[in-house]
Design a protein with these regions (language model features):
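Active-site beta-strand-loop-beta-strand hairpin of nuclease catalytic cores
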Residues: 75-90, 114-116
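Generic structural signal for short, flexible, solvent-exposed coil/loop and linker residues
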Residues: 6, 84, 107-110
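Catalytic cores of nucleic-acid endonucleases
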Residues: 96-128
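Surface-exposed cleft-lining segments at the edges of enzyme active sites
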Residues: 43, 89-97
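Acidic-basic catalytic patches of nuclease active cores, encompassing PD-(D/E)XK
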Residues: 1-73, 79
Length: 128
């Protein structure tokens, strides 16, 4: 099973999860990312970032409630309405070998937060 090796929160995000009522959604996200069997296949190109990315995308689709934007924006978003207020969490999954794509993911999240479509952004990256 995959595990979360580290979490880094910026600009009060950890407190924002509680204040906006997104903690449960955060916990659901962590479960989605870790509660499945990730098998290592002894074949060339079987365990690359693209294969792992497909596994994560399949998990988001299976769980349901997550909206996917395949290109040009945040990969996955989920929103709740709490006491009449809509709050949203956005996820970028970065498993590409190209490190320059990470800044593009940061830009996507920043744009969505700045424009008021997201309240919290998350980037998922491999630990090693």
């Amino acid at each position: 099973m995959p595990k979360i090796a580290d979490r880094t929160f910026f600009n009060g995000t950890n407190q924002k999860l509680d204040r906006l009522g997104l903690r449960k959604l955060w916990e659901d996200l962590e479960a989605l990312l870790t509660s499945f069997e990730l098998l290592v296949v002894e074949a060339r190109n079987s365990n690359g970032g693209a294969a792992v990315r497909v596994m994560f995308d399949d998990r988001f689709r299976t769980v349901g409630g997550w909206e996917n934007r395949p290109t040009g924006g945040v990969n996955w978003t989920k929103c709740y309405t709490i006491n009449g207020t809509r709050v949203c969490l956005g996820i970028e999954i970065q498993f590409s070998a190209r490190s320059d794509l990470l800044i593009v993911d940061v830009q996507h999240l920043r744009d969505e937060i700045t424009e008021g479509r997201l309240d919290v952004g998350v980037i998922v990256v491999p630990s090693k």
